[in-house]
Swiss-Prot record:
It is found in: Cytoplasm. SMART domains: HATPase_c. It holds the Pfam family HATPase_c_3. It comes from Francisella tularensis subsp. holarctica (strain LVS). GO terms for cellular component: cytoplasm. Its main location: cytoplasm. Belongs to the heat shock protein 90 family. InterPro entries: HATPase_C_sf, Heat_shock_protein_90_CS, HSP90_C, Hsp90_fam, Hsp90_N, Ribosomal_Su5_D2-typ_SF. It comes from the Bacteria. This is Chaperone protein HtpG. Residues 555-628 are annotated as: C. HAMAP family: HSP90 (MF_00505). Molecular chaperone. Has ATPase activity.
Length: 628
């Protein structure tokens, strides 16, 4: 059959350009990526052949082979895995099905060091071949297909690609790289074997190369016999003492396609009623598309060394940053995703590894604060999801949380709840916090004034998830958690008798004027009262103990979400009796000015709180009216 010519989709063209021009300094990854693809193809066949043995075509000696030809200037990576059909070749090698590709391309900065890191997080897979090759040929046949229905794919990365139907005796795929002249040094046995040992030594499948012998003068002879050049015992099945730190890190890079080292790993073997091996990694940095809800996540599930699938059910969503492998002896080889969703063994493994991860994070936080801080900066926001999502581990997760506070001095989240409790005032039995949409807005919120004056530390929460999290986290270590922007604040135990008496007198003096202000504001407020929070500012707004904060109401409205009954309620206006503006209001006889000042005190408090101002122009006009 004659060859057919195709053009790459636009995003592939862009990615190829990036690979060729940005990753030249990381050329070694091409072999890791091709070996990884071959390993995946073999694992797929191994799994498919459980239910259809004919796919093996009487060949169960699964292997990946690496050959090089100095005369032809080629490197060939071949496997006897599942192979591809013509349609799969066009789909897999001509387009990028990976979600978030466009966002990834838009996120590139032009800074090569930063872009290299982003490209590494994205994973370029097969296209890394063009780092070292000016032409790539792929010959492949799907297991079970007729020998005459194989497919040949050819591209120089410049002018699209061609596809034609060919005859191929053996199933599987071979990728032939026509090496660029500046990379001809790769055409050496010791170079290629070194790359295998560096990047792919621990994969499950044998990687084979032709034997090389050297005579007494150092001249090499390549034999026709193949030998295995990698350690085929799965790294997760080896004892910890057998695995070096370098091997752990290279296996992480192999499964994650990350350029950076893992932050930490957890290697565990469980025996008894439930038997499994696990090797789990926590990355240093979150990938560029970490918040993409459509992105798949999960550990690789093996059953007795046979790869089954990537499985989300092995981890709760708030631990989706964890990479790694679970190998169980207690599951059937023909297990399906549907069966896994209702499998008691999977449920037990999930519970056990979740507990293990949280335990190891607690140890890390205790032993290496700097490394834990790096983890928190990358994944703290997603860990917070667990407070609401995982009731059984809520207290453990809460102990891992970190925050900025009024005493920490900047926006960096470094203070644990245990740290806060250790610094509480002698008679304090409540953990105070404030939620806001930015650090500066929280740190300068007028509702902190009384707390600062009395030396009471307040936690500053500024992540979007915080208020949702705190609706579940109502106490920690037997201490009540209290938002300072909700409900009444009782600081009487920190007050002198003189100040208590003074406040009671002011409340009585303002009783009439507070009623008048409430009448003026009518449907805009739930109540008007004197504040125990304010010392310098004239006014603030709060909601009741069970209401949703005003900035949260604003975020939900902007997202087009409706409120549950009672959540989107009117604010409570609090006034500082000692402020000049409030004193002026108290003594104001002109009804128009009284109404304007009442409105102004409410609107400026709403503005400071980040609440939605229904008519911003009316607010501006009101301010301008009284600027002298």
């Amino acid at each position: 059959m004659s060859e057919k010519k195709y053009t790459f989709e636009t995003e592939v063209d862009k990615l190829l350009h990036l690979v060729i021009h940005s990753l030249y300094s990381n050329r070694e990854i091409f072999l890791r990526e091709l070996v990884s693809n071959s390993s995946d193809a073999i694992e797929k066949l191994r799994y498919e052949s459980i239910s259809n043995a004919a796919l093996n075509e009487d060949d169960t000696d699964y292997a990946i082979r690496i050959d090089f030809d100095k005369d032809a200037k080629t490197i060939t990576v071949s496997d006897n895995g599942i192979g591809m059909t013509e349609e799969e070749v066009i789909e897999n090698l001509g387009t990028i099905a990976k979600s978030g590709t466009k966002k990834f391309l838009e996120s590139l900065t032009g800074d090569k060091s930063k872009d290299n890191e982003l490209i590494g997080q994205f994973g370029v897979g097969f296209y890394s071949s063009f780092i070292v090759a000016d032409k790539v040929t792929v010959r492949t046949r799907k297991a079970g297909q007729d020998k005459s229905q194989a497919t040949k794919w050819v591209s120089d990365a410049q002018n699209g690609f061609t596809v034609e139907i060919i005859t191929k005796e053996k199933r599987g795929t071979e990728v032939i790289l026509h090496i660029k002249k500046e990379h001809l040094d790769l055409l050496e046995y010791h170079v290629l074997k070194g790359l295998v040992n560096k990047y792919s030594d621990c994969i499950n499948t044998p990687i084979q190369m032709k034997k090389v012998e050297y005579d007494k003068d150092g001249k090499q002879t390549v034999k026709d016999e193949y030998e295995t050049v990698n350690n085929t015992k799965a790294i997760w099945l080896r004892s910890k003492g057998e695995v070096t730190n370098e091997e752990y890190q290279e296996f992480y890079k192999y499964i994650s396609h990350d350029f950076a080292d893992a932050l930490m790993w957890i290697h565990n073997k469980v025996e008894g009623n439930l038997e499994y091996n696990s090797l789990l990694y926590i990355p240093q940095n979150k990938p560029f598309d970490f918040w993409n809800r459509d992105k798949d996540y999960g550990l690789s599930l093996y059953v007795r060394r046979v790869f089954i699938m990537e499985n989300k059910e092995l981890l709760p969503p708030y631990l989706r940053f964890v990479k790694g492998v679970i190998d169980s002896a207690d599951l059937p080889l023909n297990v399906s995703r549907e069966i896994l969703q209702h499998n008691k063994v999977i449920d037990k493994i999930k519970k056990a590894i979740t507990t293990k991860i949280l335990s190891e994070l607690k140890k890390l936080a205790s032993k290496d604060k700097e490394k834990y801080q790096k983890f928190w900066d990358s994944f703290g926001q997603v860990l917070k999801e667990g407070v609401s999502d995982d009731y059984s581990n809520k207290e453990k997760i809460a102990g891992l949380l970190r925050f900025a506070t009024t005493q920490s001095g900047d926006s960096k989240q470094t203070v644990s709840l245990a740290d806060y409790i250790s610094r509480m005032k002698e008679s304090q039995d409540t953990i105070y916090y404030i939620t806001s949409d930015s650090y500066k807005a929280a740190a300068n919120n007028p509702q902190l004034e009384a707390f600062k004056k009395k030396g009471i530390e307040v936690i500053l929460m500024t992540d979007r998830i915080d208020e949702w999290m705190m609706s579940t986290l109502t106490e920690f270590d037997d201490k009540h958690m209290k938002s300072i922007i909700k409900g009444d604040i009782d600081l009487d135990k920190f007050e002198t008798p003189e100040n208590k008496e003074k406040f009671e007198k002011e409340a009585k003096d303002f009783e009439k004027v507070l009623k008048e202000i409430k009448e003026v504001l009518k449907d805009k407020v739930e109540d008007v009262r004197l504040s125990k929070r304010l010392t310098d500012s004239p006014s603030c707004v709060v909601v009741n103990d069970y209401g949703m904060s005003l900035h949260m109401q604003k975020m939900m409205e902007e997202a087009g979400q409706s409120f549950m009954p009672g959540m989107g309620m009117k604010p409570i206006l609090e006034l500082n009796a000692e402020h000049n503006l409030v004193q002026k209001l108290k003594n104001e006889a002109d009804t128009e000015i009284f109404a304007d000042l009442s409105e102004l005190l409410l609107l400026q408090a709403m503005f400071v709180e980040g609440a939605k101002i229904e008519d911003p122009m009316a607010f501006v006009k009101l301010v301008n009216k009284y600027i002298r």
